[in-house]
Amino acid sequence: MIHLIKDILTSEPKGQAIDVYGWVRTKRETKNLVFIEINDGSCFASIQATFDRDTGLDNNTEALLKKAGTGVSVKVSGNLVPSPAAGQRVELQANNIHIFGDADQEKYPLQKKRHSMEFLRDIAHLRARTNTFGAVARIRSQMAYAIHTFFQERGFQYVHTPIITGSDCEGAGEMFHVTTFDIEETVKKALKEKKDPDSFKIDYSQDFFGKQANLTVSGQLEGETYATALSRIYTFGPTFRAENSNTSRHLAEFWMVEPEMSFFTIKENMELAEEFIVYLLKWALEKCKEDLEFFDSRIKKGLIEMLKNVVNTPFTRLTYTEAIAELEKHIDRFEFKPYWGCDLQSEHERFLTEEVYKGPVIVTNYPKEIKSFYMKLNEDGKTVRAMDVLVPGLGEIIGGSEREENLDILQGRIKELGLREEDYWWYLDLRRYGTVPHSGFGLGFERLLLYVTGMGNIRDVIPFPRAPKLAEF
């Protein structure tokens, strides 16, 4: 059986024979000893294998040890013993080494030094071998597991929503189109027929799906169809935005967690969102201790304390109108001046959480003009039952709402926003047949990971980032 290093490090050292598999992180030598640090990615820590020349290493082992530089993949055999060195419980008294794959030390990009994030993005296929990105990957895995565990424990059904869709959930139009048409041939044909460029339109009825199709921006609308049959569901999958934003906060491909709950009003929706965030941060603090300690010391000082503060502080609830009134008291503090009807900017969100309320905040009842068509209209006719969960150090981490269950009002909102009702016929059917109050929210998975890890760029918390002019690997 092949043992992971994380299990070996916590096992009882009794001199038992064991094989260690992994990649060499560092090697150092004295006259009689060779020390090799081996890591397999299963945990942050490496295990030290010590070769003692006084025991009589054969020529083959000596030759292999010379080749065992950083990045070389190995199997090292020996006996597991208590370590005399400070900071480690066990080490391997090694007697044999096998090299699976060499790594030319002159060419291997990951040298024994700190590399910049920009450099590591250029070699995203290798960056998971570093301490930083190995820790990001493990936390990403744990957070995904925690998300499924949270919802499964509460009776939610996991639903797979389509990647290719004919609808635009957000109504923003910033979507990647999916087509089997040959673009060059389509252009050549139009030029040959001397069609007026201003009047030329592609006939998608002849395309693969018989209509214009896109990559999904959200699984919410499809999720609602199952929530109105199974009561509580959640989706967790990739979404896509063709937004030409080249910033540290935007990706063209990212993962979304979207629960939808029948019979939930905005009140229950807020309660679930708060419970969800607290659950995830507690999970990270308990299950990812070693990796979080690394991020706290090397990436963002005070990270663990910030996460604990969110876990231990009740979420303040206030309306959008109350938030604007509070922000207007300090209007000179902001680059973007707040006013009723504006979308809250990151600087506003962080001011509310970090300086006014000193903890997480849930803002509700936003102006309808800045929110999506499916959000429930309030009695005032001006605001909708939207909610945003804001946390210190980041700003918005969750966005959601009570959904509009009234057919006439929903049709009016679709018309008001200039959307085509025929594109949403099936969504409107949910209001025609057994409509119910229902609510939901969305959590951007990478935004959660930015928060938990303290990393500064969203491109560094996803294995292979997709952004404008960036589609390598």
UniProtKB/Swiss-Prot annotation:
Transmembrane regions: none
EC top class named in words: ligase
Alphabetic keyword roster: Aminoacyl-tRNA synthetase, ATP-binding, Cytoplasm, Ligase, Nucleotide-binding, Protein biosynthesis
A Pfam entry, by short name: tRNA_anti-codon
Chief place of localization: cytoplasm
Source superkingdom: Bacteria
EC number assigned by the record: 6.1.1.22
GO biological process: asparaginyl-tRNA aminoacylation
Compartments it resides in: Cytoplasm
Key word Protein biosynthesis present: yes
Entry-linked SUPFAM superfamilies: Class II aaRS and biotin synthetases, Nucleic acid-binding proteins
One term under GO cellular component: cytoplasm
Keyword Aminoacyl-tRNA synthetase: yes
Family: Belongs to the class-II aminoacyl-tRNA synthetase family.
Assembly information from the UniProt record: Homodimer.
Listed NCBIfam families: asnS, PRK03932.1
Protein name, entry field: Asparagine--tRNA ligase
Protein species of origin: Treponema denticola (strain ATCC 35405 / DSM 14222 / CIP 103919 / JCM 8153 / KCTC 15104)
